[in-house]
Amino acid sequence: MQVYEETKTTAGLTLSDWTKKFWEWLFQLSEEANPVTVVGPSRPWRYGGRQPTQFQKQCMEKHGESVWFIAPAPYSEPNSVIQLYIPVGNWWFLIGPAIACSSQQLYPSLDSIDKVRNHVNEDIGKTNELWTIFDGFSIPWYYIDNTDKFIEIKNVPTKESKNMLHQNLEEGTIQTLQCGYWNFIEPVVPGEHLLTIHSKSSIYRVDITYQLSVSGPAN
């Protein structure tokens, strides 16, 4: 598997910066709207995750380009086909086929930064199958390692949370470490596009196809 280093800046942010924004977006979604939880109905709209966010809109207005997040959806039905409606514009696509994020607040037994770092690295190290195909072509992976220091994510919804009710979260803030394999696709022409994500490890499996309709309106 060949892994590339991405150095391009998109809308004023590096790929590493955008992966941090991805996790912020994911953790700030309610469980019913979050594509990587099993809480709530498995409806197609949830895989869009209430995008575009205010930050994504601001980037588009300021820079003339922005980034759309596509989650791996590890708890979707095997071989699911999900249609996403995306507004016309210079949208890059950030895809996380095999990614990991961990926190002391979510896993109290990880009582040091080294233990949290080992947790995410071990999770990614278990990946034994990985491929992503866009419009019939395999696309490259970029490995991003954001484990040097904790990354704070605020406004995590914890009230009435079925997954986080037992966690020791103060004011909905968590300190995270993140790493994993990402795909980053340049803006595409309006119309229909097909994205297939497959990844497998000893702890999870992702098999999902997204039909991307770049014509709007957004989900």
Label the predicted regions:
Residues 1-58, 210-218:
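N-terminal segment immediately downstream of the Sec signal-peptide cleavage site
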Residues 1-14, 18, 27, 54-61, ...:
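Feature for soluble, non-membrane regions of globular proteins
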Residues 35, 40, 54-65, 98, ...:
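Extended interaction regions within the primary functional domain
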Residues 65-163:
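Extracellular-facing segments of soluble proteins and assemblies that are Gly/Ser/Thr-biased and enriched
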Residues 104-105, 194-196:
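A surface/extracellular/periplasmic glyco- and lipid-processing/surface-interacting theme
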Residues 126-192, 198-217:
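Extended, well-structured beta-strand/loop surface patches
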